[in-house]
Curated annotation (Swiss-Prot):
Substrate binds at R49, G50, A51, R89, Q201, N252, K253. This is Methylthioribose-1-phosphate isomerase. Its EC number is 5.3.1.23. Catalyzes the interconversion of methylthioribose-1-phosphate (MTR-1-P) into methylthioribulose-1-phosphate (MTRu-1-P). It comes from Leptospira interrogans serogroup Icterohaemorrhagiae serovar Lai (strain 56601). Pathway: Amino-acid biosynthesis; L-methionine biosynthesis via salvage pathway; L-methionine from S-methyl-5-thio-alpha-D-ribose 1-phosphate: step 1/6. It catalyses: 5-(methylsulfanyl)-alpha-D-ribose 1-phosphate = 5-(methylsulfanyl)-D-ribulose 1-phosphate. It holds the Pfam family IF-2B. One of its GO terms (molecular function) is S-methyl-5-thioribose-1-phosphate isomerase activity. It is an enzyme of class 5 (isomerase). GO terms for biological process: L-methionine salvage from methylthioadenosine.
Amino acid sequence: MQESGLKPILWKNKELILLDQRVLPGTTSYITAKTLEDCIFAIREMVVRGAPAIAITGAFGITLYWNSLVSKPSFSELKLKLSELLESRPTAVNLRLAIEEFSSRFPESNYSSFSLEEIQKGAEELALFMLSEDLENNLTLSKYALSLFPKQPSSLNIITHCNTGALATAGHGTALGVIRSLRDAGHSLTVFADETRPYLQGARLTAWELQEEKIQSFLITDNMAGWVMSSRKIDAVIVGADRIASNGDTANKIGTYPLAIVAKHHGVPFYVAATAKSMDFRIPNGSYIPIEMRKEEEITSFGFLKDSDGKPLLKEGVIAPKGMKALNPSFDVTPASLITGIITEKGIVSPVTEENLKKIFQLI
């Protein structure tokens, strides 16, 4: 099973190099993050996106912050910086876990005992570990997913939503990583990729990855999924996750919830592919997941799409009248009752219950 050749995150010469996903697929360009503030900007403005990639970028942001110092800040100053990082994208739990992992290694109780050099070294080691761990976990997750499909090479039709491939992770992917691994196992695939309004991650990113991987695919608008399921045999819907509550309720890119409802109606298995880093056992269900509200302009215009010079590709007002108000929740929550199974690096959870989730992650 091969990893993707796409590398959205590179650590080179103590600088973080990020593939600028705002300008894909028209332009392939990279930006260099030299400070924590650069990383916060990259996360908030979606230069980098996808819960695992956000967390890894955040970890390297912490490294860049420490590398910029000539003396240790007070612990209160450090907490403020970490808080600013956390606020850049609040829904995905992965970023919070990365910050907490750093904090657990250098806790307030014995913060004074660590030298600046020790923390600089430890921060970089953690970020590099997270980069390699995510790739390994994605590959393992994909191996487990193969058991859900025929052992013999078959023709499979799959629907996916948003972007969950190499661009969203350390380099293989969760849901799209599963699709890639099914192809590598000899299956003949046809993938229907939701365009994923309003930010068009499916149209701009997933479609691009599928073409790069030479996987047969069709781009569909989000509201075509019902037509696709009713007009041809669909073997599975596979999506990713930004946060999974204790009971299995799953926050993912807006539009996932209605896709799950349509899949349930048509008897199509609906799978979530995610690693343990997307689990949040501190919350009982999806109602506790904070939903990020983004700018209205992402709904009312395509001005957020930039060319290689950073200029808007289209003028404001081409989609909706100027002054029209819009709602723009970036995520919705799919109830566990609509999810056939959650594919993880520890195995497959099905049926999706709190007890089964805790068992597979050895919490009970």
